[in-house]
From Swiss-Prot:
Catalytic-site annotation from UniProt: K65
Functional summary from the UniProt entry: Involved in the biosynthesis of the chorismate, which leads to the biosynthesis of aromatic amino acids. Catalyzes the reversible NADPH linked reduction of 3-dehydroshikimate (DHSA) to yield shikimate (SA).
Organism: Coxiella burnetii (strain RSA 493 / Nine Mile phase I)
CDD domains cross-referenced by the UniProt entry: NAD_bind_Shikimate_DH
Record's protein name: Shikimate dehydrogenase (NADP(+))
Stored Pfam families: Shikimate_DH, Shikimate_dh_N
Transmembrane segments: none
């Protein structure tokens, strides 16, 4: 039986095996899907071992997305743009193909599942790490009015804005540089939720129709989403749908079939 996996560290709480099991039942495909916890300094060896043992593909989670991109022989446009990979495909000729579907998953979840319009909207992204880098391309493809990246270290936000500046109106800065305006969409892309915290955002960023979205899901997303509710945001979503939509795109890459994501999202929401 073909083998697939999610590779990360930590990986114990990954929902990807549950999602792929649901896709497996829905499409009548049979395969094994494993969780592989790779040592922080042993990612390449873990991938090689899985590949040598017949692995056909792998989802990549933290902290290995940049290393997965470097490991690949060929890469999708989205992966090249972001310099990160969210999934790998092991091809028949022995090469490794890298894709980055994080941004695709986010945009699909916002626009298709939640009916949020991104075109000609103002978007604030909180955080300038790999997660932000992975979503900027697809967000810019949606033709927003502008994107502002804010980060504790302003130079990182400025650097990201510079990389993508030819794609649309985009700027970066620190929290003290934030313009006093109300954004249509605010996306939280830091890891502070793991510590039960959220960034030092000022009041006055949220309007009556604003949408707030945390790339994390469950308890990790709670601090930011609670702040959003307290500030009066009309729409508040965590990243569970993004994860499912991302995995649906990966499933299509591996199997050539696009699964129905709605029942899977509903199933996960009922159990989380």
């Amino acid at each position: 039986m073909d083998k697939y996996a999610v590779i990360g560290n930590p990986v114990e709480h990954s929902l990807s095996p549950v999602i792929f099991q649901a896709f497996e039942k829905q499409t009548n495909h049979s395969f094994d899907y494993l969780k592989i916890k790779a040592p922080v300094n042993g990612f390449a060896a873990a991938v090689k071992k899985f590949h040598d043992e017949g692995g056909k593909g792998a989802n990549i989670t933290l902290p290995f997305k940049e290393e997965a991109y470097q490991l690949a022989d060929k890469r999708s446009q989205e992966a090249n743009e972001a310099h990160v990979a969210s999934a790998l495909q092991f091809r028949e000729d022995g090469t490794i193909y890298a894709v980055n579907y994080d941004g695709l998953g986010l945009v699909q979840d916002l626009t298709r599942n939640h009916n949020i319009t991104l075109t000609q909207k103002s978007i604030l992204i909180v955080g300038a790490g790999g997660a932000t880098r992975g979503i900027l391309g697809p967000l810019l493809n949606a033709a927003p009015e502008k994107i502002v990246i804010v980060n504790r270290t302003p130079s990182k936000a400025h650097a990201l804005a510079k990389i993508f500046h030819l794609r649309g109106e985009i700027q970066g800065g620190g929290f003290d540089e934030l313009e006093p305006m109300r954004y249509d969409v605010i996306i939280h892309a830091t890891s502070l939720g793991h510590q039960g915290k959220f960034p030092p955002l000022p009041d006055g960023l949220i309007g009556s129709q604003s949408c707030c979205y945390d790339l994390s899901y469950g308890k990790i997303a709670s601090p930011f989403l609670q702040w959003a509710k307290d500030q009066g945001a009309k729409y508040n979503f965590d990243g569970l749908g993004m994860l499912v939509e991302h995995n649906a795109a990966v499933f299509y890459l591996w199997f050539g079939i696009y699964p129905d994501t709605n029942p899977v999202i509903e199933m996960l929401q009922a159990h989380l």
